[in-house]
């Protein structure tokens, strides 16, 4: 039996690299209707005809997951997490079954598998489970029978044998975990955008597509608002050296590679992109220690991002979706706390910042000139993140993108 462990990302080898195994993930817009599902089926059959052993991870059709969540809350104001997982996991299964039918009509063999049937084992946290093990025996058997394997993304089975879901973007994580377990050196992520851009093109029409970014940069981008990839999927890819190729579903464009930083990437432009999010809440807490606070938040599976401590006050941010869990923890600790939902976060990200001291000064000067005063600032070797009023987020993204010349071809921009 092939088994590959993932949590907490131990230093171990996955299966031997297999150039013949291709893992492809298709998002909800790629399988939004029967016509698109048939198009995906054709692409999978073509990939197999090219000599590949094909595994495809599919998301739910269009807005199916949102519709199912809405249905749950129409029945119950606070549905039990276990039952919610049982409900919303069906969307991906529908996509896989339909795709398998389409493949059969094209003259190829296919089998659809749920996350549990595919061997995706998770912890016991419903709604945001983490993959702890991949038991790929059934996938290997199907591939050996020349079948295209369709795996329902976003889901698995817990160590307690309950159906679990992996949280938003969880199909990315499913695909990368399978790529690592199957020894596939590349995982192709098909989406409704042409790759990773220097900013959200909806805010900055002149934003450019990046040919390649490092795992480190992509992790920061994903954690700071870029919705192209889920953070966890990039962590697994980096840990198991799986290259990611983000590609458009309905275009021949080359997309963006996410891979280990190499000498060519070290010569790249100073800044790779400007990201933003309005989906975080900023908390200020007094009356506890950092160790006690963050241990309690971790126990509740709250994903903490920004952390700043000044004297007795601890400031941190967490996803808006984690608001109930976070406030339950804070109330349980008996601390004094306040929360702000009227802030957004804008981040400037680039590997070239490691050896360039002037980025922060330039970013703050640009924001000041636009009349924007950051509420909280945090940094890493390749990121500067500013929490600012939500109403100023769009302006901040535009002026920072322009100031760092991100609308110019990479060869013409400032380099490290």
Spans of features found by a protein language model:
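Nucleotide/pyrophosphate-binding catalytic subdomain
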Residues: 1-234, 387-392, 404, 408, ...
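Short phosphate-binding/catalytic loops that engage adenosine nucleotides
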Residues: 52, 108, 242, 302, ...
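Terminal amphipathic helices with adjacent charged low-complexity linkers/tails
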Residues: 58-66, 246-265, 311
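Structured, non-catalytic alpha/beta "coupling" segments that mediate domain-domain communication
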Residues: 100, 240-241, 245-246
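Short hydrophobic alpha-helical runs that function as membrane-insertion/retention elements
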Residues: 186-190, 244-246, 305-306, 376
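Acidic-aromatic/histidine active-site loop/patch
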Residues: 237
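A conserved regulatory-domain signal marking ACT and ACT-like small-molecule sensing domains
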Residues: 255-416
């Amino acid at each position: 039996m092939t088994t590959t462990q993932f949590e907490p990302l131990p230093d171990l080898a996955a299966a031997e690299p297999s150039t013949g195994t291709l893992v492809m993930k298709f998002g909800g817009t790629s399988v939004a209707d029967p016509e698109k599902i048939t198009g995906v089926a054709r692409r999978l059959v073509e990939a197999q005809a090219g000599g590949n052993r094909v595994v495809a991870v599919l998301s739910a059709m269009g807005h199916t997951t949102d519709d199912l969540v809405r249905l749950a809350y129409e029945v119950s104001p606070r549905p039990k997490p276990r039952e919610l997982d049982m409900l919303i996991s069906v969307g991906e299964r529908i996509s896989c079954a339909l795709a398998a039918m389409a493949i059969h009509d094209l003259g190829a063999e296919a089998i659809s598998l749920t996350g549990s049937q595919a061997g995706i084992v998770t912890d016991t946290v419903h709604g945001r489970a983490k993959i702890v093990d991949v038991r790929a025996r059934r996938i290997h058997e199907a591939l050996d029978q020349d079948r295209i394997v369709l795996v329902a993304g976003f889901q698995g089975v817990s160590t307690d044998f309950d159906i679990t879901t992996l949280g938003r973007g969880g199909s990315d994580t499913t695909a990368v975990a399978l790529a690592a377990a199957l020894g596939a050196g590349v995982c192709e992520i098909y989406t409704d955008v042409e790759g990773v851009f220097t900013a959200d093109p909806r805010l900055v029409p002149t934003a450019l597509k990046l040919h390649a970014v490092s795992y480190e940069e992509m992790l920061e981008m994903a954690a700071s608002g870029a919705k192209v990839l889920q953070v966890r999927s990039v962590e697994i890819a980096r840990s198991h050296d799986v290259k990611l190729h983000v590609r458009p579903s309905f275009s021949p464009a080359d997309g963006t590679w996410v891979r280990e930083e190499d000498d060519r990437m070290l010569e790249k432009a100073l800044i790779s992109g400007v990201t933003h999010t309005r989906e975080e809440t900023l908390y200020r807490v007094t009356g506890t220690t950092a160790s006690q606070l963050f241990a309690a938040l971790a126990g509740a599976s709250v994903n903490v991002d920004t952390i700043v401590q000044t004297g007795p006050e601890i400031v941190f941010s967490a996803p808006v979706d984690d608001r109930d869990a976070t406030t339950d923890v804070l109330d349980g600790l008996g601390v004094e706390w306040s929360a702000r939902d009227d802030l957004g976060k804008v981040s400037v990200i680039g590997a070239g910042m490691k050896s360039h001291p002037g980025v922060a000064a330039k970013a703050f000067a640009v924001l000041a000139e636009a009349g924007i005063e950051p509420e909280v600032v945090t940094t890493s070797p390749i990121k500067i993140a500013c929490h600012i009023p939500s109403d100023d987020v769009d302006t901040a993204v535009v002026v920072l993108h322009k100031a760092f010349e991100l609308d110019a071809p990479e060869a013409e921009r400032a380099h490290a």
